[in-house]
């Protein structure tokens, strides 16, 4: 049986579509992509296990991980605006800021301290004592070596 050009062409196109579909099904977004990281951290179980690993405690001890707003609001017109990747409050009131950074950023340490200070300062209200302030933790997940000579950062 002799095939005509049209049937060969159709079969090739069909084969190409199948290969293209398989590539799409094999696609996996890396967790270093901001969107993917934020979506993963929406999962309570994943979030608790990451926090447990970072704090070096069993996951069952991480009882509550409330996601908080990530926008660091401006107090005045001239203030710097900030947006955290993922902000979590633990049961005891401590906060953790998770930041994913793929591209090297010269002022990363300064930015991290700025974010932490805004989180910390935002915890105390008028009339409260300073003893009510809770710990704020910053976690930088970097796809590059920021502290080349520092063996403590890993």
Q: Across the structure, where does each feature detected by a protein language model lie?
A:
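Elongated, amphipathic alpha-helical interaction scaffolds
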Residues: 1-154
């Amino acid at each position: 049986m002799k095939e005509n050009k049209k049937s060969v062409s159709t079969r090739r196109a069909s084969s190409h579509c199948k290969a293209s579909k398989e590539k799409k099904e094999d696609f996996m977004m890396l967790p270093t992509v901001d969107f993917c990281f934020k979506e993963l951290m929406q999962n309570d179980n994943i979030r608790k296990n990451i926090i447990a690993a970072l704090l070096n405690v069993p996951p069952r001890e991480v009882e509550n991980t409330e996601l908080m707003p990530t926008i660091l609001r401006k107090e005045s017109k001239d203030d710097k605006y900030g947006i955290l990747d993922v902000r979590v409050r633990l049961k005891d009131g401590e906060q953790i800021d998770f930041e994913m950074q793929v591209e090297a950023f010269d002022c990363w340490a300064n930015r991290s301290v700025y974010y932490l200070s805004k989180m910390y300062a935002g915890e105390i209200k008028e009339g409260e004592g300073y003893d009510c302030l809770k710990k704020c933790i910053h976690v930088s997940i970097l796809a590059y070596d920021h502290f080349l000579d520092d063996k403590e950062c890993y």
